[in-house]
A protein has these predicted regions:
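N-terminal cap/lid segment of alpha/beta-hydrolase-fold proteins
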Residues: 1-23
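Short, surface-exposed "cap/lid" segments of acyl-processing enzymes
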Residues: 21-64
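Alpha/beta-hydrolase active-site loop
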Residues: 45, 75-96
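Alpha/beta-hydrolase fold nucleophile elbow
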Residues: 96-107
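Gly/Ala-rich beta-loop-alpha elbow adjacent to hydrolase catalytic centers
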Residues: 106-114
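Short beta-strand/loop motif that positions the catalytic acidic residue
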Residues: 145, 150-153, 157
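Acidic catalytic loop of the alpha/beta-hydrolase fold
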Residues: 156-160, 190-191
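C-terminal catalytic histidine-bearing segment of alpha/beta-hydrolase fold enzymes
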Residues: 175-199
C-alpha cells in the first residue's frame, strides 16, 4: 500500500495506492467523507472499500482532498474537491493505461462528489455509493445517470434518512439503460459501525 503524491489543481495531493499485478486490471477511485467533519482517506469505511476493491484485483487509489492530511489547498465547498477527484482519476488512469474498467466509489460527502465525477467522465463504467447524503445535497444532476451501480445505506442511519436515499434510488431505477442495485445494511448507522464487515 505505497504512499503516492500527485499534482492537484491547488498543489500536491497525498494518497495510498494498490497496484494490481495484472496489466489490464480494472481501476477504482475511492472518495472520503466531508473534510470539515473529520473525513480522510483513512476513514474506516473508505479503507474497507479500498481493501475490497484491491482483493478483487483492482488497481485502487484513495486520497485526501485538498486541505486534509498532507494534501495542499483549502476546503472549497465541493467544487475544488470535484477537481481533486478528477486529478486523482487522471493519475490513476496514467498509471494504468490498459485498464479494462473504471469504477468510482464514495462515502457520504464522497458519494456526492463521486456521482458528479461520474457525470463528467464517460469512461467511468460503474459506481458504488455509500450513504449518499440526498437530504443535504442536490443529486438532480443525475438526469440521466450514465452508468449502472450500487447504492448502500444503513438501516439505522440518522444522519441521512432512508426516505431520501430511497427516493434518489427510485429516480435512478426508473431510468433506462442502467441498473441500480440498492442494498440496505441492517443495523448499520451512517458510519456502518459494527457492520463494516457486511460491506
Amino acid at each position: 500500500m505505497p504512499e503516492v503524491i500527485f499534482n492537484g489543481p491547488e498543489g500536491r495531493l497525498e494518497g495510498r495506492y494498490h497496484h494490481s499485478k495484472k496489466e489490464d486490471a480494472p481501476i477504482a477511485l475511492i472518495l472520503h467523507p466531508h473534510p470539515q467533519q473529520g473525513g480522510t482517506m483513512n476513514n474506516k469505511v473508505v479503507f474497507e472499500v479500498y481493501q475490497l476493491f484491491a482483493k478483487r484485483g483492482f488497481s485502487t487509489l484513495r486520497f485526501n482532498f485538498r486541505g486534509v492530511g498532507r494534501s495542499q489547498g483549502v476546503y472549497d465547498e465541493g467544487l475544488g474537491e470535484l477537481s481533486d477527484a478528477a486529478s486523482a482519476l487522471d493519475w490513476l488512469q496514467s498509471a494504468n493505461p490498459d485498464a479494462s474498467q473504471c469504477w468510482v466509489s464514495g462515502f457520504s460527502f464522497g458519494a456526492w462528489i463521486c456521482m458528479q465525477l461520474l457525470m463528467r467522465r464517460p469512461e467511468i463504467s460503474s459506481f458504488v455509493s455509500l450513504a449518499p447524503p440526498a437530504n443535504k445535497y442536490d443529486f438532480s444532476f443525475l438526469a440521466p445517470c450514465p452508468s449502472s451501480g450500487l447504492i448502500l445505506h444503513g438501516s439505522e442511519d440518522t444522519i441521512v434518512p432512508k426516505e431520501s436515499v430511497a427516493a434518489l434510488t427510485q429516480k435512478l431505477q426508473e431510468q433506462k439503460r442502467i441498473k441500480i442495485d440498492y442494498r440496505i445494511i441492517e443495523g448499520a448507522n451512517h458510519f456502518f459501525h459494527n457492520r463494516i464487515g457486511d460491506l
